[in-house]
């Protein structure tokens, strides 16, 4: 992997997404031969890092691209999920580019929702738009961007379309050239007071580099790693937290329901699908 020259300003960008969304294609287009393949520390999971060089206003710039394992969530139920969330929280890349399948936007927005709670700006690469178009799924990037509060870039990576625009959007977010005000999903209304109670109980106890609100949500979700971390950290002060979590064992459903309600509102606003029974272009071609 060719290192950036001393004259280049280098930023680090994590490339994230669910499996089979074209993330590897994007990574290869961005880095070409300037990549290194190894394993994540202590894991047998492949770790790919590359460098993308570009110019902005005559200035030479370099992006160090870290290809995170494909994951459906950041719940740490698998080594891939553990790696993805630990990297973003502990290493704090300058930005995360989340690659999504435009034809399965609802499913992909769940992972995006989790990244929005982490302390790193996010850009959404809406990939496989050609597949969505063949299925006559119409997505308004402008409405989607307004609803999410993050930059949205339509892409068809297999045709190298939109990849340069993704780099430009990530660059602008990192430089603060565009406003970044993400719209995060709220927990279901009947559990918002519970979330606030947990946040109050753990205030001042959350170790760096973990965000307080994210830790509170993970405790409500029953995340094993975060529960163990906070129990060991708080020791005798853990008991009130444990009591609240025990009384509200259904909180995981409240967190998930809040996210699905948020996803539903966004999709209804930004996505148009063929009417029930309507024959799509894909059907006609088949």
Listing of model-derived features with the role each one plays in the protein:
Residues 1-76, 90-91:
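Conserved G1/Walker A P-loop phosphate-binding module
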Residues 62-69, 92-93, 124, 241-246:
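Gly-rich Lys/Arg/Thr-decorated short loops/hinges at beta-loop-alpha junctions or inter-strand turns
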Residues 149, 176-286:
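Extended helical scaffolds that flank P-loop GTPase cores
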Residues 50-60, 83-153:
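Conserved C-terminal guanine-recognition region of P-loop GTPase G domains, centered on the G4
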Residues 28, 50, 66, 82-86, ...:
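Solvent-exposed alpha-helical segments within well-ordered globular domains of core cellular machineries
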Residues 130-186:
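Canonical P-loop GTPase G-domain recognition
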Residues 73-75, 106-107, 131-136, 160-165, ...:
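Switch/connector loops and helix/strand junctions flanking conserved nucleotide-binding motifs
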Residues 67, 127, 156:
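Active-site glycine-centered loops adjacent to acidic/histidine catalytic or metal-binding residues
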């Amino acid at each position: 992997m060719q290192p950036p020259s001393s004259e280049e300003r280098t930023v680090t960008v994590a490339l994230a997404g669910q499996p089979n969304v074209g993330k590897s294609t994007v990574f290869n287009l961005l880095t070409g031969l300037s990549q290194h393949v190894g394993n994540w520390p202590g894991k047998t999971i492949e770790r790919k890092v590359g460098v993308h060089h570009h110019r902005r206003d005559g200035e030479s710039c370099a992006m160090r691209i870290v290809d995170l394992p494909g994951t459906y969530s950041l719940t740490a139920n698998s080594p891939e999920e553990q790696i993805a969330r630990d990297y973003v929280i502990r290493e704090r890349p300058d930005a995360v580019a989340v690659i999504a399948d435009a034809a399965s936007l609802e499913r992909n927005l769940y992972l995006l929702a989790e990244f929005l709670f982490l302390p790193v700006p996010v850009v959404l690469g809406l990939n496989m738009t050609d597949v969505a178009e063949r299925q006559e799924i119409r997505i308004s990037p402008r409405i989607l961007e307004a609803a999410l509060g993050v930059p949205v870039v339509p892409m068809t990576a297999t045709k190298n379309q939109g990849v340069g625009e993704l780099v430009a959007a990530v660059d602008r977010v990192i430089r603060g050239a565009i406003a970044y005000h993400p719209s995060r999903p709220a927990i279901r209304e009947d559990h918002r007071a519970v979330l606030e109670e947990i946040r109050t109980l753990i205030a001042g106890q959350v170790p760096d580099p973990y965000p307080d609100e994210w830790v509170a949500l993970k405790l409500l979700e029953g995340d094993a790693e975060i529960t163990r971390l906070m129990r060991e950290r708080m020791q005798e002060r853990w008991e009130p937290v444990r009591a609240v979590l025990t009384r509200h064992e259904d909180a995981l459903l409240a967190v998930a329901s809040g996210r699905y309600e948020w996803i539903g509102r966004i999709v209804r606003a930004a996505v148009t699908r063929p009417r029930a029974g309507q024959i799509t272009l894909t059907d006609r071609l088949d």
